[in-house]
């Protein structure tokens, strides 16, 4: 962290050393993207931008996510960041505190068409950055939803989830949807494990929090504890959801579309996966999460993907103009996999976004959620303490998995989480 901060200062010094980047008479912008699946769409956006801005050349670098973060961190350490680059919610605070992203607040105040963007999403980024500044411009967001198998609901005679569902309604439905024959469970009512999007969705639906923002410490409140106990009880007491180890034959995202469970809570981006895996073999839809006993329904668990601007770009105004274009009027719906929500409202609120005739029929729910306040648990070191990606078996993810796998008690797991996670956070927030 201190290394990145020092290098952020170095980057500003380098800005005074290196002259305006040019190619002949053209002003050159460097744009880095982590998504090779939309390389062609990005090239189309760039072509439109260049046509509207004669004398400008945008050079695109596209890398897969893992390689992207390795290489862009190297550039940050060298003070050679591209003018505009993709930024993740999971790393925004680290980069903002290190001074490696430009403060966009003055530009947003000056000429961003706020009516055309979901400002709640921009505000979420401001909160995640932890600096009180807008350090990135969101171009897409995701939320979490309740996926449910309509065929299984119909067969069990259970009414589809509604906005009035309570946690007890959910539990009762999960029990009716669980099928046991000869002592073996053939179909579960629900599926989850310690994954962040599986757990925090319920924490926030109960108006809970995991992180104390005043101390940057892991200190789950009573509402969060209630949510995590509710989830683990679905496995250990109600027997309506499996232990994680029981589903080891599946990719976690395939348990629901392959028909092993009737309900599942995860990111809206899995709409795309469900379509590919399930096809037309099952009828399914999405609903909002049941509101917890302490929930008020005013916020939703969700987070954006962004573009950020280098603090030492010699072309700050032009970089801002391009960032607005790539997050707004320059994009088209085919830039987004099903389930990702454009932050540019004219696209999201167009009839094409609803994809009538395709599952899920209730895709309009995502538009309603985009207008709500967003909550997350992102901090410095989030992937480490949460147990994300390569660290999945560690952190809170691993602890919750151990609870539902019967390897530790709930109270023992919560105590372990408190000790281990706060050791990690203390390293980052000194």
Q: Which residues does each PLM region occupy?
A:
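Short, well-ordered beta-strand elements
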Residues: 25-36, 56-61, 84, 135, ...
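Short, polar/charged alpha-helical segment
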Residues: 36-57, 396
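Extracytoplasmic "Venus flytrap"/periplasmic binding protein-like
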Residues: 47-119, 124, 154-157, 255, ...
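A structural signal for short loop-to-beta-strand junctions that line the ligand-binding cleft
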Residues: 74, 83, 112-152, 188-189, ...
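Hinge/lid segment of periplasmic solute-binding proteins
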Residues: 89-145, 285-287, 357-362, 369-371
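C-terminal capping/gating helix-and-loop segments adjacent to ligand/active sites or protein-protein/ligand interfaces
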Residues: 129, 364-420
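Glycine-centered hinge/linker elements that transmit conformational signals in sensory
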Residues: 173-176, 214-245, 275, 289
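Mature extracytoplasmic/periplasmic domains
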Residues: 269-272, 309-390
């Amino acid at each position: 962290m201190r290394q990145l901060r020092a290098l952020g200062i170095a980057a500003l010094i380098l800005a005074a050393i290196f002259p305006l980047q040019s190619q002949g008479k053209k002003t050159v912008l460097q744009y880095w993207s982590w998504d090779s699946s939309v390389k062609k769409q990005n090239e189309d956006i760039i072509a439109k931008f260049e046509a509207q801005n004669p004398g400008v050349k945008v050079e695109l670098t596209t890398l897969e996510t893992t390689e992207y973060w390795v290489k862009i961190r190297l550039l940050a350490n060298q003070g050679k960041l591209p003018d505009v680059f993709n930024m993740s919610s999971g790393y925004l605070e680290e980069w903002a505190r290190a001074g490696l992203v430009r403060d966009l607040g003055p530009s947003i105040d000056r000429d961003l068409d706020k009516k055309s963007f979901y400002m709640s999403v921009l505000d979420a980024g401001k909160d995640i950055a932890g600096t009180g500044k807008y350090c990135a411009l969101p171009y897409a967001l995701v939320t979490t939803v309740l996926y449910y198998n309509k065929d299984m609901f119909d067969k069990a005679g259970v009414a589809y989830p509604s906005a009035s569902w309570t946690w007890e309604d959910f539990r009762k439905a999960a029990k009716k949807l669980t099928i046991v024959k000869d002592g073996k469970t053939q179909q579960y009512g629900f599926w989850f494990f310690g994954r962040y999007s599986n757990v925090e969705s319920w924490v926030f639906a109960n108006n809970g929090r995991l992180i104390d923002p005043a101390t940057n410490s892991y200190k789950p409140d009573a509402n969060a504890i209630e949510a995590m106990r509710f989830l683990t009880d679905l496995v250990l007491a109600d027997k309506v959801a499996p232990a994680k180890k029981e589903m080891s034959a599946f990719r976690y995202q395939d348990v629901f579309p392959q028909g092993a469970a009737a309900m599942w809570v995860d990111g809206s981006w899995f709409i795309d996966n469900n379509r590919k895996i399930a096809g037309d073999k099952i009828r399914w839809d999405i609903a909002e999460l049941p509101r917890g006993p302490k929930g008020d329904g005013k916020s939703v668990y969700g987070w954006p993907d962004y573009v950020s601007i280098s603090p030492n770009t010699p072309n700050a105004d032009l970089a801002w103009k391009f960032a607005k274009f790539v997050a707004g009027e320059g994009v088209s719906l085919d830039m987004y996999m099903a389930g990702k929500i454009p932050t540019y409202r004219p696209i999201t609120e167009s009839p094409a976004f609803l994809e009538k005739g395709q599952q899920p029929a209730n895709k309009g729910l995502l538009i309603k959620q985009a207008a709500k306040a967003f909550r997350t648990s992102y901090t410095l070191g989030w992937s480490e303490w949460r147990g994300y990606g390569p660290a999945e078996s560690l952190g809170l993810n691993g602890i919750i998995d151990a609870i539902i796998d019967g390897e530790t008690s709930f109270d023992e797991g919560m105590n372990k989480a408190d000790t281990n996670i706060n050791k990690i956070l203390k390293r980052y927030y000194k």
